[in-house]
Amino acid sequence: MKAVLTKEVGGPETLVVEQIDAPAPAKGEVLVDVAACAINFPDTLMIRDLYQFKPERPYSPGGEISGTIAAVGEGVDGWQVGDRVLAGIGSGGLREKVIVEAHRLFKVPQGIDLVEASALLMTYGTMIHALKDRGDIKPGETVLVLGAAGGVGLASIELAKAYGAKVVA
């Protein structure tokens, strides 16, 4: 299978595409045929060794993926071949097939585009945590969004409005 790999510290120009062996799921894991892999700011830092997590090279960047389950490992309940999923995996997403621990999977409903689904976890998850868990946002409050053009900024606008807040962006 094809994989985008980082073998040396540097920017996107240092990434290479190579053939690697396809993995097989172990106990508690599934194999996902990757439909899309979201690239986020931490991915750009990781390939430059500027992030707190530094996977051993060579590795594939890409921390969140969507796709279809291709194989299910022993002991995995609730998932089957053909299920549409998304997952936050930390790194390794820029491959044709990815091993994912079953507890990291989220089901993608029919009618939701897998490319769009791949970009939900980090951006929307970050803002749900910020607005609800940390900020305890209430209807009628005002949210100021500085930097509304990126994924997290756009998610903050949409979510703040959904929570009933007034948004200034």
Regions picked out by a protein language model, each given a short descriptive name:
Residues D21-A38, L50-G92:
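Glycine-rich beta-strand-centered segment in the early N-terminal region that forms part
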Residues P42-R48:
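Cytochrome P450 core scaffold surrounding the K-helix E-X-X-R motif
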Residues Q80, Q110-V115, D136-T142:
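Short helix-loop-beta connector
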Residues I89-A102:
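A structural motif shared across PLP-dependent enzymes of the aminotransferase-like
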Residues R104-L121:
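Short peripheral tails and domain-boundary helices/loops at the edges of structured domains
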Residues L120, Y124-A169:
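Mid-domain Rossmann-like dinucleotide-binding core that forms the NAD(H)/NADP(H) cofactor-binding site
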